[in-house]
Amino acid sequence: MSSLYYANALFSKYPAASSVFAPGAFPEQTSCAFASNPQRPGYGAGPGAPFSASVQGLYSGGGAMAGQSAAGVYAAGYGLEPSSFNMHCAPFEQNLSGVCPGDPAKAAGAKEQRDSDLAAESNFRIYPWMRSSGPDRKRGRQTYTRYQTLELEKEFHYNRYLTRRRRIEIAHTLCLTERQIKIWFQNRRMKWKKENKTSGPGTTGQDKAEAEEEEEE
């Protein structure tokens, strides 16, 4: 079947459509007429004038709708207001302002995080072997705890001079360095000498020999 048959059936089913176009705008032609006629009516300047006039008449009444916005047309069809189409944009803009670099709340949160990191670094425990030993490091007076002093005094009571192996053992036990143990024993020996007033030549030579032996070990 030809396409013209379906077109005629459609227009006969909806008779109201025939009143839109002027009579004679679409002359009835068969499918053979379209194939045999190279110049079809309606595409030229002369025969197509009624069709163009009918089209202008069709859209002339819709000029009032042309000035309306698309949102207004769809809102009127569905019973909504034009402002309802922009309702979904408000939460997005609020969320966008929350992640903006200039947001004061975000800046305050970043400052608090930085302060907490600095506080955590300041509370970080530093052991003696973690301290820097460069030439520019300012040395301070070493303080010993009561437990460390008690253990060192006990060791000094039994032996005033320590071997290197014994210094390593005491340093690991008391969480000190070998240098700290060595300095403490040197100061303790000087204090012991002042208390006992041992200024004899024999005793001084013996202490010097023992000190040299300690350095070699």
Swiss-Prot record:
A GO biological process held by the record: myeloid cell differentiation
DNA-binding region: 137-196
Xref: SMART domains: HOX
Region (Disordered): 192-217
GO cellular component: cytosol; nuclear body
Gene3D superfamilies: Homeodomain-like (1.10.10.60)
Subunit structure: Forms a DNA-binding heterodimer with transcription factor PBX1.
Protein name (database record): Homeobox protein Hox-B7
Record organism: Mus musculus
Lineage, opening ranks: Eukaryota, Metazoa, Chordata, Craniata, Vertebrata
